Structures are given as structure tokens and as C-alpha cells.
Amino acid sequence: MVNMKASMFLTFAGLVLLFVVCYASESEEKEFPKEMLSSIFAVDNDFKQGERDCAGYMRECKEKLCCSGYVCSSRWKWCVLPAPWRR
């Protein structure tokens, strides 16, 4: 009974180790963290670079009007999605 528990534990530990090694080598190849950060900032830059006279989702709407499809929250003064319970 002890041998079976030990062998199951070693098998599980080996699979976890294999997963970690494969993930690490794949991450190095793809440079996952850099790609993720650059994609996040690229989306943010699109909003900054584009000439807009409206505010997008979760942007302040005190001075700007919200873009189409959004409404200005009277409580928080952010552009949010319209919902039946919001007025």
C-alpha cells in the first residue's frame, strides 16, 4: 500500500515537473510576458493616438460625451454600458 502511494506521488510530481519545464521553454520561445505587455499597451495607445471627441468604456465623462453604445453614469461620472436599471 505504501509503495502504491509513493509511486503515485512520484508520478504526479514528475508530471508537474514536466509541465513546468515545457511551459518555461515555450514561454522563452514566445517571450510571453513581453508580448502580453506590448499587446496591452498597444491597445491603450490606440485610444490615445486616435482623435476622439467621445469617451470610451470606464472613461471620465464630465467634459466629454460618451461614445455610442455607452451612457454616462450619474453616480460615478464614467461611461458605462446601458442597462435597464440605469437611468
UniProtKB/Swiss-Prot annotation:
InterPro entries referenced in this protein's UniProt entry, alphabetically: Huwentoxin-1, Huwentoxin_CS1
Originating species: Cyriopagopus hainanus
Family: Belongs to the neurotoxin 10 (Hwtx-1) family. 51 (Hntx-8) subfamily. Hntx-8 sub-subfamily.
UniProt signal peptide: 1-24
Disulphide bond pairs: C54-C67, C61-C72, C66-C79
Taxonomy, superkingdom: Eukaryota
Propeptide: 25-52
UniProt subcellular location: Secreted
PROSITE patterns: HWTX_1
Cited function: Ion channel inhibitor.
Protein name as annotated: U3-theraphotoxin-Hhn1a 16
This protein's domain notes: The presence of a 'disulfide through disulfide knot' structurally defines this protein as a knottin.
One Gene Ontology MF term: toxin activity
Alphabetic keyword roster: Disulfide bond, Ion channel impairing toxin, Knottin, Secreted, Signal, Toxin
GO cellular component terms, A-Z: extracellular region
Tissue-level expression: Expressed by the venom gland.
Keyword DNA repair (UniProt): no
